[in-house]
A protein has these predicted regions:
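Short conserved beta-strand and strand-loop elements enriched in small hydrophobics
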Residues: 54, 60-77, 123
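Compositionally biased, intrinsically disordered low-complexity segments enriched
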Residues: 34, 57-60, 73, 93, ...
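Polar/acidic, low-complexity leader/linker segments enriched in S/T/G and N/D
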Residues: 1-62
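Residue microenvironments linked to proteolytic maturation
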Residues: 10, 14, 18-28, 66-68, ...
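A generic alpha-helix propensity feature with a strong bias for hydrophobic helices
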Residues: 47, 75-78, 150
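Short, surface-exposed beta-strand/loop "edge" segments at domain boundaries and coil↔beta transitions
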Residues: 32-41, 73-78, 106-109
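Short, solvent-exposed secondary-structure boundary motifs
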Residues: 1-5, 69-82
Length: 153
């Protein structure tokens, strides 16, 4: 099995609330299926739906879906680098739209500062699984794929 990482560059920055109770979020496509991405990979919809369902049940719904600032080299979340918590993940066509709250951790404060200064931050997903080369020239993600985190910044 290989570490599989995908990057998506367009996320929207949202502020909810006002004053000291204001919370900063990023929202946008966190995952994509049924299209060949920039890394030359394609995730079948059935695999992505299964993994998003599992990830949502085990992590998002329990407040445990954390992500890091920076793109780690492994599939585990390093708590000292946590910057955000994924609060929603839902399917829209071939995209899975995520929403993540920027946390008040040291890395979250860096992410918040960068976003408020207009830096365009993208997200990347991480998982492990096998890849199969296709005759069309792309690699298809295998049935053994397991989503580790839906979005790191």
């Amino acid at each position: 099995m290989k570490l599989i990482r995908e990057e998506i560059e367009k996320v929207e920055v949202i502020t909810e609330g006002a004053g000291k109770s204001a919370k900063l979020y990023i929202k946008g496509p966190f995952l994509q299926a049924e299209c060949v991405n920039r890394n030359g990979r394609m995730y079948p919809m059935s695999i992505m739906e299964r993994e998003v369902k599992r990830y949502t049940e085990q992590y998002v719904n329990k407040g445990r879906a954390l992500g890091e600032l920076g793109h780690p080299d492994g599939p585990t979340v390093n708590l000292d680098r946590v910057s955000h918590k994924i609060v929603a993940l839902e399917q829209k066509g071939n995209n899975f739209i995520g929403k993540a709250q920027i946390l008040s951790t040291p890395m979250g404060k860096i992410a918040e500062s960068l976003l408020k200064e207009g830096v365009c931050l993208g997200v990347s997903s991480h998982g492990i699984g096998s890849l199969t080369s296709t005759k069309e020239g792309y690699k298809q993600v295998g049935e053994d794929f397991m989503l580790a985190t839906a979005a790191d910044i």
